[in-house]
């Protein structure tokens, strides 16, 4: 049964961000198998904010992941997974869009030949099944640079993040798989004094599908996703209505992928009509990986171009090093253009 479990879980969880594996403490709790991962990142950046100023910034991040599971006599795998991560901005003058974030995931799951069900706080299928520009280490155009300058690419549809939901993921059948999720409410920054930063959406639904086929040693994949939710009238924001279509090519160590994303006016206050095209490539080795990606974003008030390159290297089982260089140009409809860059470095300790 362990071989069946490994095959099934790997087939139902396509990685979207390529990163070298972290170490984990594995142990048994009676009939249950458990693993615990502790991770800490120290990050520094040198950046030009696009208005003629250069500065430095730094962040300290930490993450704890815990997984507890059991294989039943029926062949089902059942378990509980929890994750908590926190990011601390060590510079009070740096307040990028992703600084001081807290992300919680906790959900129960069951998997078998019929597929996989997850219930709790977890990313939905619009995120996990969507193909797009690959990411390595710090993420390139959808990465940590956005803590310091500009804003990140979406890569896929506007999804319900890790808000509470029920998820079903089908097993792969002839290279095809699909997923669906439903959640009663989505609450992000609902107490923020700035109403523009509040997200209060109800009845969020995600639908996603993916198809992969091998052709002469090359694996070709396509994906599609759709997300809808109903905005709370008190916020005066728009409903979430977003979709994306992506593709990926895999050949040995090479990954090439891209996507078109339509976010429309999703959760916007005054209408944004946002669309994005992203494209990238990655080369993945056992101890190191590199990637390059680019994105063009159009919305009612802004045209944004992003380009980035980065890599990661596993020093040993406990230490990895990552670096990114990302450049941006923000062309505002009602203002001057801004161009700048961010150079980031990071050391990660894992146990």
Language-model segments: residues:
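Outer-membrane beta-barrel architecture
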Residues: 65-67, 107-109, 167-169, 208-210, ...
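Repeated loop/turn-to-beta-strand initiation elements of outer-membrane beta-barrel proteins
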Residues: 74-78, 114-118, 175-178, 215-222, ...
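Detector for outer-membrane/organellar transmembrane beta-barrel domains
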Residues: 202, 206-310
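Outer-membrane beta-barrel "beta-signal"
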Residues: 213, 319, 339-351
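Transmembrane beta-strands of outer-membrane beta-barrel pores
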Residues: 42-48, 84-88, 123-125, 182-186, ...
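Outer membrane beta-barrel
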Residues: 26-46, 55-187, 201, 211-213
